[in-house]
UniProtKB/Swiss-Prot annotation:
PANTHER family: 50S RIBOSOMAL PROTEIN L15 (PTHR12934), LARGE RIBOSOMAL SUBUNIT PROTEIN UL15M (PTHR12934:SF11). One of its GO terms (biological process) is translation. Residues 21-31 have a biased composition (Gly residues). Binds to the 23S rRNA. InterPro entries: Ribosomal_uL15, Ribosomal_uL15/eL18, Ribosomal_uL15/eL18_sf, Ribosomal_uL15_bac-type, Ribosomal_uL15_CS. It comes from Burkholderia vietnamiensis (strain G4 / LMG 22486). It comes from the Bacteria. SUPFAM superfamilies: Ribosomal proteins L15p and L18e. Residues 1-56 are annotated as: Disordered. Belongs to the universal ribosomal protein uL15 family. This is Large ribosomal subunit protein uL15. Part of the 50S ribosomal subunit. The keyword Phosphoprotein does not apply.
Length: 144
């Protein structure tokens, strides 16, 4: 056994370093905070985003956009999703039961993403021009 080969026992843990507890520890007196200044004082930190009195970036940039309040009540369904539904008559209730739109949805619109190869009847749903054309090309129809 030699001094340079000493190891702590298995499962041993180092004690947490205690600052400000004497010069011999290497972290006494100023406790690693340096001399004077805001950061050396207790409670000496500014809030996040504070830039020393300069107008903060968040306030320098213009506001933009808004959050739509109707977003959660309007659903969007792809043609490819309608292809997978087991029913031929599609309305809002069928979409809710299939989990394609949320329970709070009051209206839905079909968009032309994906392919539709079978005949379906759409009741009470909106559709984009492309989606309407694709449904009618597959032999489907719209009933209001």
């Amino acid at each position: 056994m030699e001094l340079n080969n000493l190891k702590p026992a298995a499962g041993a843990k180092h004690a947490k370093r205690r600052v400000g507890r004497g010069i011999g520890s290497g972290l006494g007196k100023t406790a690693g905070r340096g001399h004077k200044g805001q950061k050396s004082r207790s409670g000496g930190f500014h809030k996040v985003g504070f830039e020393g009195g300069q107008m903060p970036l968040q306030r320098r940039l213009p506001k933009r956009g808004f959050t739509s309040l109707t977003k959660e009540f309007v659903g969007e369904v792809r043609l490819g999703d309608l292809e997978k539904l087991p029913v031929d008559e599609i309305d809002l209730l069928a979409l809710k039961q299939a989990g394609l739109v949320g329970e709070l949805t009051k209206s839905a619109k079909i968009i032309a993403t994906g392919e539709l190869k079978r005949k379906i009847v759409v009741k009470g749903l909106g559709a984009t021009k492309g989606a309407r054309a694709a449904i009618e090309a597959a032999g489907g129809s719209f009933a209001e």
